[in-house]
Amino acid sequence: MVSFKNLAIVTLAVTTTSVEGISFSNIYLNKAITIFKNPTSLIPSFSNSKLINYQNTKPIPGDSPIEVCDASEKQLLHLDEVIVTPNPPVAGQNLTFTAVGTLDKTIEEGAYVEVEVRYGFIKLIHQTYDLCEEIVKVDLQCPIKSGKQTITKNVEIPEEVPPGKYLVVARAYTKDDEYITCLTATIIFPVQ
């Protein structure tokens, strides 16, 4: 199963070590499925509306919906490329996420990530997580050494993902509140 929290965290982890996002956890997907028992009926209400757009974003080279947000602010992580296959992600299919980036400073225990996930204008998640606890789920661990790294992760996306537009934003900080990165992605799952 998939959770957008982990999409954001994996994106960070994959981009933090090279550098998000993508391993998803069941909790929030199940919450979304519960909220939207008949998601198909919700699609028209979002089709003409815009998601909340974050200003000051910068595209990341490669084939991915992920962008750097708060791009004018100094960040410790610099992404060279992020590739998501297939792009856009497809419910019921495997997703491959590859990221290449450089980390200016080693990330130690105490680092954290603030994650927000919206379905259209509906906020599904707004929580803070221990980054070092979460990256274990994507085969990484703290300390995350500075320097250039490449990471590839395969994830299964469940068929039960409600169709619609999802906005994922993740802001990561060191234990001393230095800005590691801000990543955002708009993901659209079409009606099947």
Swiss-Prot record:
CDD domains reported in the protein's UniProt record: PG-PI_TP
GO BP: intracellular sterol transport; sterol transport
Organism the protein comes from: Candida albicans (strain SC5314 / ATCC MYA-2876) (Yeast)
Leader sequence residues: 1-21
The entry's keywords: Lipid transport, Signal, Transport
Domain of life: Eukaryota
Propeptide: 22-56
Keyword Transport: yes
Listed transmembrane segments: none
Similarity remark: Belongs to the NPC2 family.
One GO molecular-function entry: phosphatidylcholine binding
GO CC annotations, alphabetized: fungal-type vacuole lumen
Name listed for the protein in its UniProt record: Phosphatidylglycerol/phosphatidylinositol transfer protein
Stated role: Catalyzes the intermembrane transfer of phosphatidylglycerol and phosphatidylinositol.
Pfam families xrefs: E1_DerP2_DerF2 (PF02221)
Encoding gene, per UniProt annotation: NPC2
Subunit-level organization: Monomer.
